[in-house]
């Protein structure tokens, strides 16, 4: 089987797996299928191996550690090393614009700056000292966030839109999610840095992909490779087609083509996620609220069995006040007074 077919099959499998993970997180029937599949595999895989895998997954995803930060920096370093070592030099020989070639480095610098801010900024940790102040920031909707609820772990009253992070073991104001790639919670005070981090990471991956593609296209055009012919295994003469051309480029520039495939897939994945977080920002939702929206009781859902004495409770977004106000809330978050004094 041709290399290109195998490579495309691999990419399709990865993308399909990610799509299924996203869909399963919101679809209860698919969750049941996933649990059933896990039970089947548990009967096949030895128990000692199951414990080892479970322990590893628990460490990676349910404890604070720097594994994914290191992986993030290693992957980013490998991409930019290859870009600098080969693509940048070849593009200079082709006399491409220097500003065009330096753009990925500019995006890298901005990305690392906001990556550091996202990792190190307090996301909005709720303590006994600021508990009362946070209780007055957002209105309780009495559906997803009822009043007078205490956190069973922190023993603090839970402000609206807050959540206890089981990984970090603290409650976070306007909790969005825990991101393993930055080893920190994403909350009210660092969501702005996280948005710019994702934006610049997407832009840097896309820019590296565009520059690398430009180099390969220039090479094909200048060498007239698309006009060449080749002889197949049966001795038949063929004009150079796209599949054969890509395989030829892979054999000639394997590291560049492999890096290009990686950053192209990464650009699509990050681009899709960026659109999602921008949608949440524009509608003043958090990832936690978006996910829990399916669990909130809704009179529009005919499959929900209501208790006889219960009034239908409709979850609606009471925090969205227009695009401008929503974005202002993210990029200019409210700080409790005593927290401002500490920072000053």
Swiss-Prot record:
Residue positions of motif Di-lysine motif: 341-344
Membrane topology (Cytoplasmic): 24-67, 121-192, 277-344
Listed GO MF terms: palmitoyltransferase activity; protein-cysteine S-palmitoyltransferase activity
Keyword field contains tRNA-binding: no
Listed InterPro entries: Palmitoyltrfase_DHHC, PFA4/ZDH16/20/ERF2-like
Pfam family, one: DHHC
Catalytic activity: L-cysteinyl-[protein] + hexadecanoyl-CoA = S-hexadecanoyl-L-cysteinyl-[protein] + CoA
Residue intervals of the DHHC domain: 149-199
Phenotypic consequence of residue 342 to A: Impaired localization to the endoplasmic reticulum
Keywords: Acyltransferase, Cell membrane, Endoplasmic reticulum, Golgi apparatus, Lipoprotein, Membrane, Palmitate, Transferase, Transmembrane, Transmembrane helix
Enzyme class label: transferase
Protein task: Palmitoyltransferase that catalyzes the addition of palmitate onto protein substrates including the D(2) dopamine receptor DRD2, GSK3B or MAVS. Mediates GSK3B palmitoylation to prevent its AKT1-mediated phosphorylation leading to activation of the STAT3 signaling pathway. Also catalyzes MAVS palmitoylation which promotes its stabilization and activation by inhibiting 'Lys-48'- but facilitating 'Lys-63'-linked ubiquitination.
Name listed for the protein in its UniProt record: Palmitoyltransferase ZDHHC4
Gene that encodes it: ZDHHC4
